[in-house]
Structure formats: structure tokens, C-alpha cells
């Protein structure tokens, strides 16, 4: 049998075995595991001398698996494993063997023993092996090992003692490690085991560790892992055992620990052990007494002196050791800050006593701990610096909170704050080791951003100190930057940036109306001006960090650059500064930079700067008639669109470049129309001739390129090139629009019509023609359809209703596409909703949609049917479907496939489109003769839902709102919307009211109460849906009222047909009808949800 297992295990682990062979071997091994004598078989596999390490490992792993199963976890089986494994282990560890077991096997043995411990130790396990620790101490001759201080002690005995410690560590990890989430039952069992250990074994273990720490140094050097495992044990167990077992009155135990602080092999374990000890939870005053008693600061004085005298003492070789030490000292300081917080929050303590304790703790920090941590923070290794950050966060928060408690509080800390800020300045600088973008990003994330946050807290604590220090730092660097490294200049710009952030966010605590004239603002303006006057030096710099940071600084602080306080005697005027900034952007420093990341970022920032400084730019364009031509000529090389290759997805390998190139098109469009809008000073109306010929300089190359694409035919590269050109034209149109119309008026058609000139309309009519010609050639390609919709959406505000003839053709071409994707239809429906909103009062638009509605609805249904067919085909052919299981709040799992997701999104977009008819008062379209045949289809879509769709609450909300509004607008068969200018008062559709009643009433009651819908009224989204259902019932009641006969068809249907049919009690029926007929809208909705649905749901 053992040979057979060996063959199977080898087959499973052999990389040359095929999948079928491995699967068969695993099945056979599982069969052996399920046999009655499985424990005996795998014990034999472990202890057999002929078993190799792989077989032993597999055997031990299987024993763990078998012991944790209910069938084998019986006293006889556990005792068998206990007896055989401990006997074999004694020979392996203590026998005079030349080769010891590898670590991975020893760890697995520890896991077996830990499993036995968890199943047999303490009264919660039936007291099966309460002598666990005694037996293993005897097995490994622990008493002999710790009582023999002779250097000739048997090495195997020491190894056995080390193994015993590691076993204790694994047990502690199982019962006390807080990083694992355990069940309540498991936690109670672990607590029971810990209580049992406290009562019976912890003192023995503590004594073992104590004796280990007393061993002769030669023995320690013979087996350094023994001391490390001992220290690890103390650090691991200290969180839940009595502290007095480790800390005695004479600190003898602790002194034994301290003696390993300076041993190379034990330093890290010693630091971690002390860290765990000082982190032991105690009451604040007990903790303060404890921290003072252990006298750790005296033990650490050596390290403070060492690093102060020789910072280079920390090297890559010993970095891990120093990181552990830094973490220890940081944690030591944090414990004192926690004491401060706890004392301050204790309501029982006297105020004067609190202040005394806080002052005492603060003095300890300032005198003994902070000087050491400042040295570590100032170290050149980022990892050392970062280890100190948790303490600074706590301590600066303490200073910020208590700065107002005493007039002398801040002055007492001024030296610290001054030193701390100076170190922040130094450690913010990039080092020579940071050479790649990844290096810079890592430094920013781990060090610089945190130091920036610390600076911001210092501003709040002592504004004058911060402003004085940062001003001196920036001034000195600006003065000497030409002789310094690039890192110094980059840091200078970064600190100016930080000063601006502190000023804009008002960390200085100024009145809002004083910020722009305050000293921080004046200082910032001075630095920005000095930086701009260094143009020649800037342009000569070839460093991407500086180039990007400078542009970001200028764009984000434009308001300071052009503020009234910026016009000092030494500063150039606004126009000159503006032109200076433009020239910097349009140079090799920025937009023509040889580095792609700088170039692309500058394209965005250039356009952002133009839009932010709209008023300044408009003034300059009015004074400089040829400026727009100069700018266009300079950046025209960047407007050329080129597709060199495409990837497997059919997109450009340089898509990122094109996406950023669109910012330039937007920016140049913005400048062109802003230039012409500046002529408002002399032009009275939108019809005054204004020259837009400069547009031809941009559009003509694009049109020529499009013509070439049409001539070449539909290759993938040509199609992508056409897509890019159309997107560029649409983005140019967006820039032209926002340059001409104020930002807060871009959607106001009246303002648009007034400000947009006829000459611009003429040019964009030509653009619309070109787009339609291109689209007609390539309309079967979805990215062309996407780009065409995008561009037409940007032309609408400019052409207004003059775009409708073009839109008509566009819609026809899109609907004629045979391969229209669901996401395209979603976008298209949104596009059409925008048209309805903008032109709902236009007769031509009304006629357009009157003709469009039926084919559009048919197209939506066609796509939904295609989605359903695709899903059915995948299911029937067992093809893999991209799925995700979504657990809803009502604990109903819905399998969400791509097709299901597409269908839900399309239905939501469809309902939103229908909503646009009611929102814009054009519901009469739905009642017209031409659309009367499609109306039943639309209404059926709104009253038919699957159980899965009910769970899609966002879609249901839109759908129910549309249904409510339809009932409100034409629920009795006639158009009831008085704002609908196209309604026919003589038109009525008979039977529509009865249809709404018979279809909607069942929905109102079935959705909340039918179990298949899993309607959870306690969940927020479903409660909102319940309010929508109440509104639906109320709208039915209102529209069904007949003032002539005083009858209500809705009430009639409820009381005589539906409610008796579902066997609603008579008293509830009377109450419901009474509330429906007497309450207002909001009152009835609240009653229906809280007192009808919620109450009845409780009885289900």
C-alpha cells in the first residue's frame, strides 16, 4: 500500500504527468483517505524510513485533514496519532542523526501537534491531553536543556528546545492571533483554552523562556534560533498573559531581554519582543508607571548617540535591524500619546490633574523620545523615515488639539516645530537614487505626501513659524537654484505649490475676505512672479519632474498670478505675464517636449489654463488682433491626426496620444470664438459679420483627410482614422461653443441663438454635411456611428434647430444599421432625449419624432430579442458565459450575465427616453394616428416585469415613474398635459383608462406581496419602489374620477373585482379605499407604505 501511495503522490507532483493522470491519482488517493484504516496507513507513511520528505509531508498533511474530520476525530484515533508521532518525533529531533529534518517538515509536524492540541487540550475537549506541555517538555528534555549552562550541551537538545518554542508560537497563533476572523463558537473555545493555560501551564512556559534567556552566551551562539524563538514567544503571548510573569519588581526578567539588544543575531527579535511588551493594554496611569519603570529610553541612548555621531552607521546590510529599532521607538512614543488621549477623555479626572499628567508626558516625549525619532526621520533611508510617521501623526494631532489650552503651549514646542519643519524640507527632496518615474511615484506616496500633510498641520499650530520657515527656504533656493542640483529647484517649486495649497485652503485661519490680501498670499504672489521671471532658466531645464510640476503650479494658481496684489513694482503687468506663460506652454518645455508624458500632460493643462483665465485671455485677444493666428500657427503641427497601426482590439496603439490631442482641438476652438466674442465691444448683434475664416486653417486639412479615407475604402486603419477625425471635429465644436457662450449659459438655447453668429452657423452646416457623407459610407462600423453621434451632439448648441434636417438623415442611417450594439442604442436613446429636451417646442422636431417613434421602438425590441437569442444560444450549446453572481439585499442570488446586464441597461435607457416625452410636454406624439399602433407595445413594456427585473431597483424606479406620468398625462385616453402645444383636444383613445386599471392594479399589489419577487420593504431601494407604487395607485384614482357620475372606475375595480379576488379582508379594503379617496398625495403614499405594505409584510 505504501508503495502504491508513493506512486500516486509522485504522479500528482510530476510536471510531466498529464491532467487525466493527475486527476485519476487524486481520486485514488481520496479513496485511500476514506478507508477505515486511513489513520494507520498514513501514520505508517510518515514514520517509514524509506519514505522521502515529499511522502512524509503528504502523510502529515493528510493526518491533519483526517483528524479534523468528524469520522476520524475520535479519542482512539487522536491518541493513536499522538502516540506514534511523538515517539517518531523524539527520535528525529533528539536521536544522534547526521541529517536533521528540513524546516518545511518540522513546520508540518508542529501543525500536526497544534491540531492535536486544539482537539485534545482543556476541558472543552474532554481533558484528553491536559499534560500536553508537560509531555512535550519531557519529550524534548527541556528541563535538562535549560538547567545545563555548559557549552558542551548537546546541540540536538537545544534544537528540541527551539522546536518546542516554535510549537508554542504556532499554538498561540491558533488561539490568540487577532488578524484572523473566527466564528463566535471558535472564539469561545479559544478563550476557554487560554483560561486553562493561564491556570495550569503559562507559568511553566514563562519559566522555560526565563531559563532560556539565562543560557550561557556560548550556548546561545551555538543555537541563536533558540533565543529568537524565545523572544518571539514572549512577544506573542504577552498580550493575553499576566504582565507580572514577565515584569518583576527588580526588572530582572526584562534585563535579561535587554541584554540581547546588542547581539547581531537577536536584535530584531528583541526589538519586536519589547515592542509587544510595551503595547500591552493597561489603564493610562498604570501604563505611564509601567513605561517609566522599564527605563527603555536609557537602553536606547546608545543608538541615539551612535546615529547622531555617524548617520552612515545605517547601511543596506543592516537596514532591516534599524527599521525594527525605529518601529520600536516609534511605538514607544505612540504609547505616550495614547496615554495623553485617554487621560484627557477620562471624565472622572480633575482638570488640573489632567493638565499635570499631560504636561509630564509631553516633557518625557520632548526630552527623551522626540530627539531620537528626529534623528531617524532625518536619515537618508526612506524606509527609516517612514517608520517614524505614525508617531508624528499622533503627536502633531495632540499639539493641534491642545494649542489653545495654554498661552505657553506653542512657545514650549517652537524649537521642536522649527527642527521638525527643517527636517521635512530636507526629506522632501528627491535623492540621486530616484531616477525612474516609478521611483518618483513611490517616494511621493511613501514619504513626500505624508511630509506635506505634516507641514499643513504645522501651519495650523503655528502659522507665523511655518510662513517664516518656508519663505526662507524658498527664497534661498530661488536665489541659488542656478548653482544647485535639479532636485533643489524641483523641491522649491513643490514648496511654492504647498504654500499655495495652504493659502487656498486657509490653513492660516484668516477671514475669507482677507485671504487674497494677506501676508501668505502676498508671499505666494512674490514667489510666482520670481519664478516667471526665470523664464530663460526654466526653458533650459530638461527635467520632466520640474516641467510638469511648473505647469501644474501655474494652472492651479492663475488667480494669484493675475490678482491685484500681483501687480507689484517688480512684476510685469498681466498681459505680459499671460503672453509669457503662453510662450512657455507653446515651447519644447511643454507642448513640444521630447518626452511623451510631459507633452501629453501639457496639452491638457494648456486648454485648462485657457478656460480658467477666460477674462484675461479675452482682454488680451482684443488688444492683440493677430494673437489667435500666431497661436494657431504655432500649435498647428500638433493638430495632425495620424494612425500608424492598430492592435487586436481594432484601436490605435497610440490611443492615449489621440485622447490628449483632443484637448488641443478644444483649446484652439475656445480661443477662436473667444477672440470673436471679444468683438462684442463693437458688434451689436449675432448677425454682425464676424470672420471665422481661421477655422478653415484647421478644418480644411481634416476634410481633406476624410476625403482621402473615403477614397481608400474601409480598411481598419482608415476606419479608425475617420473615427479620430470626427471626434476631433466634435471636440473643436465643443471648444468653439464654450468660448462663445458663458459657462453658466451653455445649455440655454435663447442665449446660444443670440450669441452664435450666422457665419459660424454656415461653417458648421458644412461640417454637418461632411459628417453625414462620411457616415453614409462607413455607417456599418460602430466606432464611426459612435463618433458621428458624439460630433452631432456638439453641433446641436451651435446649429440649434437648423440641425434637424441633418439629424433626420443621421437617425435614418443609424436605425438602418443591422449590427447596432446595445450600448450604441443606449447612447443613441440618450442623444434623442437631448434633442427632445432642446427642441420640444419646435414643430419640425415634433414631426421628426412623430415619424421616428415607431421604427425606433421596433429597433429597441429587435435588439432586446437579439440579446435574448444570444443568451439562449449560449445556454443551449453550453458555451461559457461571462457571469457574476450578485447577492441582493433580500438574499436572492441572481446570475448576472453580460446579456442580462446589457438588457437591463437598455431597458433603463428606453424608459428614460420615454420619460423625456412627459418631462418636455410632448406626450401627444404617443397618441397620434401614426403611433397609435405602437402605443400598446410601449405600454406593455411598462407593465410587464420578470422577478429578476424587480430586483433592478434603479431601472424599476424609472419605469414606474414613466408609468405614473403616462397615466397623469393621458390616463383617460385624451392628452391631459396643458403645456403640450401639439395636443388635439378632440382626440381620444377609448378603453385606455380600463387598460391602465386592469394592468396597473395587479402590479401595485403583486410586486410587494408575491413571494417570487422577494420584495424586502425594510431595504431602502425597495421602500422607494413602494412609494412609487403608492403614487401609481393614487394617479389611477385621480385620472379615473368621473365628475358627471361621481363614480371612479379605479375604486370600482378595486372593491368589486380585484381585492375580493385576492381575498383581502373586508375591513382592510374599506380602510384602503377610504385613505385613497380622502388623503392627499404625500399622505397616502406614507400611509400605503408604512401602514399597509409594511404591516401586511410582517404577517407573511
From Swiss-Prot:
<keyword id="KW-0963">Cytoplasm</keyword>
<comment type="subunit">
    <text>Interacts with CEX1, GSP1, GSP2, NSP1, NUP2 and UTP8.</text>
</comment>
<dbReference type="GO" id="GO:0006409">
    <property type="term" value="P:tRNA export from nucleus"/>
</dbReference>
<dbReference type="InterPro" id="IPR045546">
    <property type="entry name" value="Exportin-T_C"/>
</dbReference>
<dbReference type="Pfam" id="PF08389">
    <property type="entry name" value="Xpo1"/>
</dbReference>
<dbReference type="GO" id="GO:0016363">
    <property type="term" value="C:nuclear matrix"/>
</dbReference>
<keyword id="KW-0539">Nucleus</keyword>
<keyword id="KW-0694">RNA-binding</keyword>
<dbReference type="GO" id="GO:0005643">
    <property type="term" value="C:nuclear pore"/>
</dbReference>
<dbReference type="GO" id="GO:0005737">
    <property type="term" value="C:cytoplasm"/>
</dbReference>
<comment type="similarity">
    <text>Belongs to the exportin family.</text>
</comment>
<dbReference type="GO" id="GO:0000049">
    <property type="term" value="F:tRNA binding"/>
</dbReference>
<dbReference type="GO" id="GO:0031267">
    <property type="term" value="F:small GTPase binding"/>
</dbReference>
<comment type="function">
    <text>tRNA nucleus export receptor which facilitates tRNA translocation across the nuclear pore complex. Preferentially interacts with tRNAs with mature 5'- and 3'-termini and does not distinguish between intron-containing and spliced tRNAs. In the nucleus binds to tRNA and to the Ran-GTPases GSP1 or GSP2 in their active GTP-bound form. Docking of this trimeric complex to the nuclear pore complex (NPC) is mediated through binding to nucleoporins.</text>
</comment>
<dbReference type="InterPro" id="IPR011989">
    <property type="entry name" value="ARM-like"/>
</dbReference>
<dbReference type="Pfam" id="PF19282">
    <property type="entry name" value="Exportin-T"/>
</dbReference>
<dbReference type="InterPro" id="IPR016024">
    <property type="entry name" value="ARM-type_fold"/>
</dbReference>
<dbReference type="GO" id="GO:0005739">
    <property type="term" value="C:mitochondrion"/>
</dbReference>
<protein>
    <recommendedName>
        <fullName>Exportin-T</fullName>
    </recommendedName>
</protein>
<dbReference type="InterPro" id="IPR013598">
    <property type="entry name" value="Exportin-1/Importin-b-like"/>
</dbReference>
<dbReference type="GO" id="GO:0071528">
    <property type="term" value="P:tRNA re-export from nucleus"/>
</dbReference>
<dbReference type="InterPro" id="IPR040017">
    <property type="entry name" value="XPOT"/>
</dbReference>
<keyword id="KW-0813">Transport</keyword>
<keyword id="KW-0820">tRNA-binding</keyword>
